[in-house]
């Protein structure tokens, strides 16, 4: 037993917990509510305990008659889903006339809430005014009329339980009570619309007599048992709950309903009760709408949601038919269970039900449409993947792709409209799929654009490298201007080739930015790398002027050549190369940008001076070699003619014998012709050196004799500085286009040298060293043929020693 309303008229704070403990909150609408009213100490609580097994507090007879139940108490019957309300007794000494309003409020509460109102009366009090609760019954009738007027409620059912009955003819008791009720009804002022109504249009009266509990205990127990059956046995002829009352509200909202009802009654001293029918309708319609929604949710879960859990399954037309079937069933359930309530409440919760169904179903609808969206995306991906992976000249890649996007978008919109549920104006966000396809197009377009530009730039960079290397190899006065023109031309060709292809394949073609800067950075790296080999470039420029004629043939030194002038001009050619590479001038002369990396020092002053000193040491050997050749040529030219005549006359016999021998004659012609040709070409010394190299190699293979070893040690070559013959190591730099690979000395296009020129350079260095040794060991005044021959033999020994 729990108190729900205190004696002071306040709702208990834990009302929700009381209802929950009773279990009524889980009963839905499958329960009944019964209230009992009557005079104080008339045995109301005892009657409820005996009928339903409850434990309402009863009067202690040892303390005498006094108020036991204060306020309103509630408990659930043990033998059935019946919620019982034990109302504080009327006509109590404790309250007196000071607070008769509470009795009226509690009576109103019991009548408005309960399906069945039990009035507990003593048989001996029938016919009296206060003892028979005539004032309270009058209040009940007035309140019932107000409820009827406000909401056209059904009849209120009242059960009169007559206690301590002794009259054999119970009909007399019924007659007396009915007479009193009609008298009370006659005293009530009815509105014009109800003046033709009788009391029986508003109330159903039922009567039951119970014998004395103490004197007639056995009969009393039988009376209680019989009355209990009328409450719990649905098959009982006089079952009290045959008709479903509209006063029952869903158990889950009962506590809220009780609280709201009591607040209205308690705050309105004039008992201006609001529309209880509307309140009841709202509760009932809400319950029905919830049940209909649950039914709908369960059905669509089985027919739509579970099959759609597998993304590969497509319901097709079944989605729409299954959804509409579930909606129809839910609406029918709601209408069948709610049509009897007020139309305003029915329509309100019908709209709420439709909204709830729509809120649930739209997620399924979007999921269903997403299947078609995935199909569209798969088809688009397959289509775009099947196109060429690179732009073609004159192609229309973007136009073809955009046409496919438009086609798939229209198909998706049409499919989603066909799946739309009747009564709902949903719109599938197909723009997301369209955006996804457009993003994919842009992604492919960006990748292919970068690929196209990268390929064109790479091709043009190769051509640029060849031309730039040639310019760096020539290293003339116009080198920097030509490099700048080459950079601009290469950038323009790259951009033109790129735009020619891109303009027909992209909707909004835009030129790539930074092409000129990319070529400038790349050219700067090539120039820096080429500057590392400045010594070789200077030597190449010197040799090109000093060792070769203007027609490109090797120069054979004679006394007719102006050696000093040629040497100075050749040395100046080498120094010009150093000056060219000292400072980078890739930037335009009009570009005055401070700290421009295109205008930077390549070779510092200190390094430049060091290089120039090494260059002077390196080329002096070529000068000495040429000077020696001139001197030798002069000696050969000064042999007097008579000496040649005397030589031929004295050796005529030997010459004739030599010429008469075919073998010797052939060998003489062969070797003589070879010598003349090689000597004319200036390659005789080279041929002799090559022959000595082969001989020395054979000697090394067979093993040298001690004498040869001593000769080798004696004839060591004069040391040459390593920096004069060994090029600096290649460097590795990084550009926007990737690392510049290390390049070997013999790669001509990076350093401006050909392989042949490089080899000639090293040969010249060796020859120069040999001539230095020759100069140190022979005086300048030894200009005869013998000294020249001796120098040549000594030079041969030096070279053989060098090879060891």
Curated annotation (Swiss-Prot):
Cytoplasmic side: 1-638, 684-804
Lineage: Eukaryota, Metamonada, Parabasalia, Trichomonadida, Trichomonadidae
Its biological purpose: Probable GTP-binding protein that may be involved in cell development.
Main location, first listed in the record: endoplasmic reticulum
Name by which UniProt lists this protein: Protein SEY1 homolog 1
Superkingdom classification of source: Eukaryota
GO molecular function: GTP binding; GTPase activity
GO CC annotations on file: endoplasmic reticulum; endoplasmic reticulum membrane
Topological relation to the membrane, as annotated: Multi-pass membrane protein
Compositionally biased region (Polar residues): 751-791
């Amino acid at each position: 037993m729990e108190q729900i309303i205190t004696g002071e008229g306040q709702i208990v704070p834990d009302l929700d917990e009381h209802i929950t403990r009773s279990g009524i909150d889980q009963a839905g609408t499958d329960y009944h509510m019964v209230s009992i009213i009557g005079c104080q100490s008339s045995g109301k609580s005892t009657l409820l305990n005996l009928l339903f097994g409850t434990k309402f507090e009863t009067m202690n007879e040892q303390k005498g008659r006094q108020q036991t139940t204060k306020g309103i108490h509630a408990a659930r019957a043990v033998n059935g889903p019946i919620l019982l309300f034990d109302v504080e007794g009327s006509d109590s000494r404790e309250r007196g006339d000071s607070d008769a309003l509470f009795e009226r409020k509690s009576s109103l509460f019991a009548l408005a809430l309960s399906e069945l109102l039990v009035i507990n009366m003593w048989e001996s009090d029938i016919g009296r005014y206060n003892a028979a609760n005539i004032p309270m019954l009058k209040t009940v009738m007035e309140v019932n009329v107000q409820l009827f007027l406000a909401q056209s409620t059904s009849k209120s059912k009242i059960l009169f339980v007559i206690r301590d009955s002794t009259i054999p003819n119970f009909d007399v008791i019924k007659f007396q009570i009915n007479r009193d009720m009609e008298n009370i009804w006659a005293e009530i002022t009815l509105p014009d619309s109800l003046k033709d109504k009788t009391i029986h249009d508003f109330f159903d009266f039922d009567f039951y007599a119970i014998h004395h509990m103490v004197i007639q205990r056995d009969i009393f127990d039988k009376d209680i048992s019989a009355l209990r059956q009328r409450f719990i046995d649905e098959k009982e002829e006089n079952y009290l709950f045959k008709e479903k009352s509209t006063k029952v509200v869903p158990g889950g909202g009962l506590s809220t309903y009780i609280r709201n009802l009591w607040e209205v009654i308690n705050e309105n001293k004039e008992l201006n009760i609001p529309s209880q029918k509307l309140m009841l309708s709202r509760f009932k319609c809400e319950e029905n709408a919830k049940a209909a929604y649950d039914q709908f949710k369960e059905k669509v879960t089985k027919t739509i949601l579970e099959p759609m859990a597998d993304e590969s399954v497509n319901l097709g037309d079944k989605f729409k038919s299954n959804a509409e079937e579930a909606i129809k069933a839910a609406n029918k359930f709601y209408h069948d269970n709610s049509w009897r309530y007020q139309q305003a409440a029915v329509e309100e919760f019908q709209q709420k039900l439709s909204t709830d169904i729509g809120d649930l179903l739209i997620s399924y609808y979007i999921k269903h449409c997403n299947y078609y969206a995935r199909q569209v995306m798969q088809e688009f991906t397959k289509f775009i993947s099947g196109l060429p992976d690179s732009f073609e000249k004159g192609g229309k890649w973007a136009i073809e792709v955009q046409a496919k996007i438009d086609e798939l978008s229209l198909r998706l919109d049409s499919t989603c409209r066909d799946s739309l549920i009747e009564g709902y104006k949903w719109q599938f966000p197909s723009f997301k799929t369209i955006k996804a396809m457009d993003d994919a197009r842009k992604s492919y377009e960006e990748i292919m654009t970068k690929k196209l530009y990268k390929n064109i730039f790479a091709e043009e960079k190769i051509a640029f490298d060849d031309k730039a290397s040639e310019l760096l190899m020539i290293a003339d006065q116009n080198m920097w201007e030509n490099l700048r023109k080459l950079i601009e031309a290469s950038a323009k060709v790259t951009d033109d080739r790129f735009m020619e292809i891109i303009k027909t394949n992209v909707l909004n073609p835009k030129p790539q930015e930074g092409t000129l800067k990319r070529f400038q950075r790349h050219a700067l790296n090539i120039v820096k790398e080429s500057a590392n080999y400045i010594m070789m470039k200077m030597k190449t420029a010197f040799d090109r002027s000093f060792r070769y004629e203007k027609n490109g043939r090797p120069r054979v030194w004679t006394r007719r050549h102006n050696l000093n002038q040629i040497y100075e001009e050749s040395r100046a050619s080498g120094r010009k190369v150093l000056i060219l590479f000292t400072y980078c001038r890739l930037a335009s002369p009009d570009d005055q940008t401070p700290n421009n990396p295109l205008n930077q020092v390549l070779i510092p002053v200190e390094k430049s001076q060091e290089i120039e000193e090494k260059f002077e040491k390196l080329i002096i050997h070529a000068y000495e070699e040429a000077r020696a050749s001139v001197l030798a040529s002069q000696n050969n030219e000064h042999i007097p003619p008579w000496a040649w005549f005397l030589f031929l006359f004295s050796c005529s016999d030997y010459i004739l014998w030599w010429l008469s021998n075919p073998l010797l004659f052939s060998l003489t012609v062969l070797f003589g012709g070879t010598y003349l040709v090689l000597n004319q070409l200036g390659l005789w010394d080279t041929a002799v050196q090559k022959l000595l190299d082969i001989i020395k190699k054979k000697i090394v293979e067979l093993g040298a004799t001690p004498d040869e070893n001593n000769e080798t040690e004696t004839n060591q070559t004069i040391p040459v500085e390593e920096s004069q013959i060994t090029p600096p190591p290649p460097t590795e730099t990084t550009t926007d286009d990737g690392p510049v690979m290390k390049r070997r000395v013999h790669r001509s296009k990076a350093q401006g040298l050909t392989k042949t020129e490089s080899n000639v350079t090293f040969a010249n260095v060796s020859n120069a060293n040999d001539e230095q040794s020759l100069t140190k060991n022979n005086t300048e005044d030894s200009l005869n043929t013998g000294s020249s021959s001796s120098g040549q033999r000594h030079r041969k020994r030096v070279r053989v020693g060098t090879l060891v």
